[in-house]
Amino acid sequence: MAVQQNKKSRSARDMRRSHDALEASTLSVEKTTGEVHLRHHVSPEGVYRGRKVIDKGADE
């Protein structure tokens, strides 16, 4: 088991933890349908950047 040789200072600990914060994912609104979706992902209706890329009716 690894054991540190010297005690980490509060500053070093906090600087390491500065990248651990959770942030909300960035959402986009589809300009044609108004649907909200993740950036660079297809909307639930199968539309990406104004074009229909997935035909939802063919799967069902």
Swiss-Prot record:
InterPro entries (UniProt xref): Ribosomal_bL32, Ribosomal_bL32_bact, Ribosomal_zn-bd
Keyword set includes Ribonucleoprotein: yes
Biased composition (Basic and acidic residues): 11-22
BP GO annotations: translation
Region (Disordered) location: 1-44
Keyword Ribonucleoprotein: yes
One GO MF term: structural constituent of ribosome
Top-level taxon in the UniProt lineage: Bacteria
Stated name of the protein: Large ribosomal subunit protein bL32
